[in-house]
Amino acid sequence: VKVPAPFAWNEDFATSYKFIDLEHRTLFNGLFALSEFNTRDQLLACKEVFVMHFRDEQGQMEKANYEHFEEHKGIHEGFLEKMGHWKAPVAQKDIRFGMEWLVNHIPAEDFKYKGKL
């Protein structure tokens, strides 16, 4: 999936769950802000929205007994592990990785739970 320019959520990433789509917007906004204002505070804020979203999304999956929950959780944990190594100012290659990961993760992984949560 191509990284949108400017980097922002759009309907191509809609999951059909309003609360998840709203949180996905915050992920896009967090990475965009980090690319524009590459500070320690912005990095911490970006990490925080990812942690919060993954917790919320995984909670919904668990509640619905989503069959791919453990696999999906592992993918989230792998991303957070990589993000945990980022230090401000974050290298552009790492920010780009985060953007590419997000635009690929939503259609490849999150779309699998459409109609199942």
From Swiss-Prot:
Q: Does the keyword Transport apply?
A: yes
Annotated residues that bind Fe cation 1 are located at H24, H53, E57, D110
Gene Ontology molecular function: any one: iron ion binding
The record's annotation in Pfam families points to:
Hemerythrin (PF01814)
Could you confirm whether the keyword Transferase appears in this record?
A: no
Q: Where does Fe cation 2 bind?
A: E57, H72, H76, H105, D110
Key words, A-Z: Iron, Metal-binding, Oxygen transport, Transport
Note the InterPro entries from the entry. Haemerythrin, Haemerythrin_Fe_BS, Hemerythrin, Hemerythrin-like, Hemerythrin-like_sf, Hemerythrin_metal-bd
Cited SUPFAM superfamilies: Hemerythrin-like
- Taxonomic superkingdom: Eukaryota
What's the stated role of this polypeptide? Hemerythrin is a respiratory protein in blood cells of certain marine worms. The oxygen-binding site in each chain contains two iron atoms.
Q: Which NCBIfam families match?
A: hemeryth_dom, Hemerythrin
PANTHER family, sorted: BACTERIOHEMERYTHRIN
Name the protein family: Belongs to the hemerythrin family.
What does the annotation say about its assembly with partners? Octamer composed of two types of chains: alpha and beta.
What this protein is called in its record is: Hemerythrin subunit alpha
